[in-house]
Amino acid sequence: MSALFYIVLGLTIAVGGLKTWDAIWSFRAQTLADYAEADTPALKDVLGRTFQAEGVIYDFTGRVKSRFNARIVGAFDDAGGTLNEEFVYASGAVDRREWSIRFLPDGQSFTATAPDVIGEGEGKITGDAIRMTYRLQLPERAGGHVLNVVDWLYLLP
């Protein structure tokens, strides 16, 4: 057999191995089903208050790009409400975002919009975890890129 065949075979095995590793053992492998054993509280009870959050932003390779603290103030009724966030990053930069959130009939899912979000974000609570996906338009000072964001929020006592 030719050397080219073995090179292609080796690359195929390597790529397949990396994809398997990523799907099974990386932080991207988690799903909401992983948190289903805990009781699922009502979204308005979880989000409809003032709370503090700490977070980490990862790049596409899984490396930490930034850390932040956030103050989050929610005001909700049975249909939805607003979530005001103020982020203070390790660099000292400050960002603010106001989400408009609409609860869906299943009681666990929601849609969300914000001025710097393209279209609608989608979220769901299961057990003590909330997962939300959306497309974020970065400000020009940060390059103006559009990011596909997957936010995980973990509820602590």
What do the PLM-derived regions correspond to, one by one?
Residues 1-63:
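Amphipathic/hydrophobic helical signal segments and adjacent flexible N-terminal regions
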